[in-house]
């Protein structure tokens, strides 16, 4: 019987020593939204609660300023 090995999730922001997540850093923010534009939950990404709150706030600010789209496809 084969065992499934799941890689341990870790918080990238804690490992890098990030103090504040910047809403202008679109390359980082795009890693934490789905193709449809939803924010990926921390149980999937492994992000700590402190940084997940900063991340969601930064994504929402970037959306408001039209740096990120709200959805992928506008029809």
From Swiss-Prot:
GO molecular function, one term: small ribosomal subunit rRNA binding
Naturally occurring in which organism (per UniProt): Buchnera aphidicola subsp. Acyrthosiphon pisum (strain APS)
The protein's role, per its UniProt record: Binds as a heterodimer with protein bS6 to the central domain of the 16S rRNA, where it helps stabilize the platform of the 30S subunit.
Keywords from the UniProt entry: Ribonucleoprotein, Ribosomal protein, RNA-binding, rRNA-binding
Any Pfam family hit: Ribosomal_S18
Keyword Ubl conjugation: no
Coiled coil: none
Gene3D superfamilies with a match to the protein in the record: Ribosomal protein S18 (4.10.640.10)
Quaternary context: Part of the 30S ribosomal subunit. Forms a tight heterodimer with protein bS6.
InterPro entries with a match to the protein in the record: Ribosomal_bS18, Ribosomal_bS18_CS, Ribosomal_bS18_sf
BP-aspect Gene Ontology terms: translation
Protein's name according to its UniProt entry: Small ribosomal subunit protein bS18
Annotated GO CC locations: cytosolic small ribosomal subunit
Stated family: Belongs to the bacterial ribosomal protein bS18 family.
């Amino acid at each position: 019987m084969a065992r499934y090995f799941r890689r341990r999730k870790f918080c990238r922001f804690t490992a890098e020593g990030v103090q504040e997540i910047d809403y202008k850093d679109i390359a980082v923010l795009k890693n934490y939204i789905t193709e449809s534009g939803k924010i990926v939950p921390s149980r999937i990404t492994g992000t700590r609660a402190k940084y997940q709150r900063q991340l969601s706030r930064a994504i929402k600010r970037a959306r408001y300023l039209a740096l990120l789209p709200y959805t992928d496809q506008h029809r």
